[in-house]
Structure formats: structure tokens, C-alpha cells
């Protein structure tokens, strides 16, 4: 069943429903999401970005086929039906190769698209908005659209070759800030204008026509725009519906199209719901989920220090800090200020650059050590109340087992619950 096309159809019919996209490769985040979708009997959209996963391995070391295998194996182990699982590729284009000449970057992008589509990813976000080494800055709408159409043609051919039919669903366009949270401190954010959104759509329609791709236009289900939501290290720019009202009304003129909103992390439940009502019917969430994972782990590390002799502790927080200092490439260009400001950002920033470090073997060993230390005997309830108060309420009511893994997963699911509630149609 084409869950996304059906969601869009219902939304356009006035149901004010939506779907959220889980943008993470962390096993505990994915387990939390799969179990939550299973309990609520909803489809689950999981997306990999072109930074995380590509034909060369991305920063996770996984190709699209590897990522699909990893997610499907996890879903099978949790008895989640694969036909309820939707895999998406985010910001697919020359993003990873902006330092190369355009011809070379786009050749890599062709292969990127082939690898995602051949692996069975069905939601494809075509994003060619970034300038390559020999490109003007910024690119014109026409160049962006021509490159996206070229990739769409590759995607269609690959899909037919591997699956006998072309059943992909596409997202086009981009938000203005770079993927993964803003680098700088923010105070105000420009909302995409209706004219800019229309220009993007028309440029893409024209470019797709030139490639003989008219027939796929109804499968372009969403346009990525900037509704005025973003976060930096310590601040969140909240959705202001009045500023996006003209943009929201503009999409009502398109029969099969809704908006996709990126960087919705840390918005209030009320803002998430209002975004859905205003036709931002695909809500992307990623850093907020690994932020919740990090919160739970820091809380458990504090509990461990109360219960376990210092020599036997995992030292998770210190191990994490040491590895981040030894390998600063994932945070150095994002976190500024004096030593103390950077230390705080490494641990607590909304941008959650720490998420890039969880796969590190030293950190993973410390995580396993922490879980072992706290799994040996029951965690005292007063300590759960002190450090994980929301989970404490559920433990006391009997709906949650107070084991380290269950406490972590439930804390992540508290964020997923906000998205689920926002996406439930009337």
C-alpha cells in the first residue's frame, strides 16, 4: 500500500493528518520508533540522509543496502511488518561532493540515487540546491531543477530495472538553513514566500517535462519549504502561523501536494499540531530523538555514580568528552566561544553533534558498561524520580519496567508521542 500517497490524499480531503519521519541511524532510536509505531498500529517512515548513508558508506559506514538490511532486521526482530515500513532518502544530490566540479559531483549523485532506489527506498528527496566547486553561488532555480530532473530520470530507470515498475514518491525543494540544524546563533528566520515556492515548482515541472517525466508529477507529493522553524545550540525559533499563512494557503491550489518541514525538532506540541493543520504534513525529526537518548544516558550515568563505586563506574560522560576532544571534526566548526561554552555545547547543544560519536567503540563500550552496572539490581525508585521523573510516573503506575534499556527507549518515545499526536487526523 502506498502509505504516503494515501496520507496526502486524506490530507487534501480535509483530514488534517500527517506523518513524521524519523531521521536517525541509532539502533536505540530506531527500536524506540519501531516499537512505538507497532503499539499504535501506524506506518513508520525512517529516513537516511546523504551524509549518513551513501554508496561509499557515509559517516555511518553504511550503504543504502546496508541501512535497509539493518532497519529490516530490527523490524523483523520486533515483529513489525515490513509493508508498514517506508524508507526515505533525504537531501539526495551532490551535497556530499560540493568541493568537486559539478560534472563529477553530479556523476556521484547519479550513483547515489541508483544505490538508494536499488536498495528499496521509496521516498526520494531530490535536492540539488547546493553549489559545487565550479558553480555560481547561489544556483538559479532552473539549474537546480534541471539537475533534480536528471536524478529523477535515473531514479525511475533504476526502479523499473530492479522492481519492474516505477512506484517512487518524490519530494523536491530545500529549506534555507543547512541540513542538521543551524551553525550560527539565530534570532529570526525568513519564511519561504509563496512566489519562491511557486517558482521552485514551476522550474521543476518544466525541467521534468524536458526529460519526458510528465507522468511522474502526481508522485511528487511534497515540497520542502522553510515555515519559520529552526534551532541553534540553546534556542528554538517557534512556529508563528501568521507568518506562514500565505505560504500555507498557496499549497491548497495544488491537488496532490503538501509541504515537508525540516528541523521541526524541539517545537512545542501545539506548534507541531499547527504545522500539520497548515499543510506541513511531513514533519522531519532527528536531533531531538538523539538529544532525548543523550538525556537518558546522562541521567543513568548520574544514577550510576550514586550506586556504583567510582572505580567500577563506566565513566560514560568522561569517555564521551575525551573522544570528542580527540576527534573534533564533527563539532569544531559548529560550536564557538570560550572553552566552557564549547564544553557545554558538546554535552548539551540542541544541535546534538554528540550523535555522531555514539558508534565509536570506546563510547559504545562505556555505554554497555553503564547498562551492565545498572541491570544487576533494581534501580531505586527515588533515583528514577530524581533523574527521569517522567519515566518514574510510568514505572509507578506499572506501565514501564525500570530497566536501563526500557527507561532510555521510553524517554525517546516521549518525543515520538508528541509527533504522533500532532499527526493524528481529525
Swiss-Prot record:
Disulfide bond annotation, renumbered to this chain: none
Name of the encoding gene: kbaZ
Entry superkingdom: Bacteria
Protein name: D-tagatose-1,6-bisphosphate aldolase subunit KbaZ
Lineage of source species: Bacteria, Pseudomonadati, Pseudomonadota, Gammaproteobacteria, Enterobacterales
Family: Belongs to the GatZ/KbaZ family. KbaZ subfamily.
Signal peptide extent: none
GO cellular component terms given for this protein: plasma membrane
NCBIfam families noted in UniProt: agaZ_gatZ, PRK15458.1
Function according to Swiss-Prot or TrEMBL: Component of the tagatose-1,6-bisphosphate aldolase KbaYZ that is required for full activity and stability of the Y subunit. Could have a chaperone-like function for the proper and stable folding of KbaY. When expressed alone, KbaZ does not show any aldolase activity.
Species this protein is from: Shigella flexneri
Biological processes, Gene Ontology terms: carbohydrate metabolic process; D-tagatose 6-phosphate catabolic process; phosphoenolpyruvate-dependent sugar phosphotransferase system
Pathway annotation: Carbohydrate metabolism; D-tagatose 6-phosphate degradation; D-glyceraldehyde 3-phosphate and glycerone phosphate from D-tagatose 6-phosphate: step 2/2
Subunit structure of this chain's protein: Forms a complex with KbaY.
InterPro entries given in the database record: Aldolase_TIM, GatZ/KbaZ-like, GatZ_KbaZ_carbometab, TagBP_ald_KbaZ
Amino acid at each position: 500500500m502506498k502509505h504516503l500517497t494515501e496520507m496526502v490524499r486524506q490530507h487534501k480531503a480535509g483530514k488534517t493528518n500527517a506523518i513524521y519521519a524519523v531521521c536517525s541511524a541509532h539502533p536505540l532510536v530506531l527500536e524506540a520508533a519501531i516499537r512505538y509505531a507497532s503499539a499504535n498500529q501506524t506506518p513508520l517512515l525512517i529516513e537516511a540522509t546523504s551524509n549518513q548513508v551513501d554508496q561509499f558508506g557515509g559517516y555511518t559506514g553504511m550503504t543504502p543496502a546496508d541501512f535497509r538490511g539493518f532497519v529490516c532486521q530490527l523490524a523483523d526482530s520486533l515483529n513489525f511488518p515490513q509493508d508498514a515500513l517506508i524508507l526515505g532518502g533525504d537531501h539526495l544530490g551532490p551535497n556530499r561532493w560540493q568541493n568537486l566540479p559539478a560534472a563529477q559531483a553530479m556523476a556521484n549523485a547519479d550513483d547515489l540515487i541508483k544505490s538508494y532506489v536499488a536498495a528499496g527506498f521509496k521516498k526520494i528527496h531530490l535536492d540539488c540546491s547546493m553549489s559545487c566547486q565550479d558553480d555560481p553561488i547561489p544556483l538559479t532555480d532552473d539549474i537546480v531543477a534541471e539537475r533534480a530532473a536528471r536524478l529523477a530520470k535515473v531514479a525511475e530507470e533504476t526502479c523499473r530495472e530492479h522492481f519492474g515498475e516505477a512506484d517512487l514518491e518524490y519530494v523536491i525543494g530545500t529549506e534555507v538553513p543547512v541540513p542538521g540544524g543551524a551553525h550560527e546563533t539565530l534570532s529570526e528566520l525568513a519564511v519561504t514566500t509563496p512566489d519562491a515556492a511557486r517558482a521552485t515548482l514551476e522550474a521543476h515541472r518544466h525541467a521534468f517535462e524536458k526529460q519526458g517525466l510528465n507522468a511522474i508529477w502526481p508522485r511528487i507529493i511534497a515540497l520542502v519549504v522553510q515555515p519559520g522553524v529552526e534551532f541553534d545550540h540553546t534556542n528554538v525559533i517557534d512556529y508563528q502561523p501568521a507568518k506562514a499563512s500565505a505560504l500555507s494557503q498557496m499549497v491548497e491550489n495544488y491537488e496532490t501536494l503538501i509541504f515537508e518541514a525540516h528541523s521541526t525538532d524541539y517545537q512545542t506540541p501545539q506548534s507541531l499540531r499547527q504545522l500539520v493543520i497548515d499543510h506541513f504534513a511531513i514533519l522531519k525529526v532527528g536531533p531531538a530523538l538523539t538529544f532525548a537518548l543523550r538525556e537518558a544516558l546522562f541521567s543513568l550515568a548520574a544514577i550510576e555514580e550514586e550506586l556504583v563505586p567510582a572505580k567500577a563506574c563506566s565513566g560514560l560522560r568522561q569517555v564521551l568528552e575525551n573522544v570528542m576532544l580527540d576527534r573534533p571534526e564533527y563539532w569544531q566548526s559548529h560550536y564557538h566561544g570560550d572553552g566552557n561554552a564549547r564544553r557545554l555545547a558538546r554535552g548539551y547543544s540542541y544541535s546534538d553533534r554528540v550523535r555522531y560519536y555514539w558508534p565509536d567503540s570506546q563510547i559504545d563500550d562505556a555505554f554497555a558498561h553503564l547498562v551492565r552496572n545498572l541491570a544487576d539490581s533494581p534501580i531505586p525508585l527515588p533515583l528514577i524520580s530524581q533523574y527521569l521523573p517522567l519515566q518514574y510516573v510510568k514505572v509507578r503506575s506499572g506501565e514501564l519496567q525500570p530497566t536501563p534499556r526500557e527507561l532510555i527507549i521510553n524517554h525517546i518515545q516521549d518525543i515520538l508521542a508528541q509527533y504522533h499526536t500532532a499527526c493524528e487526523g481529525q
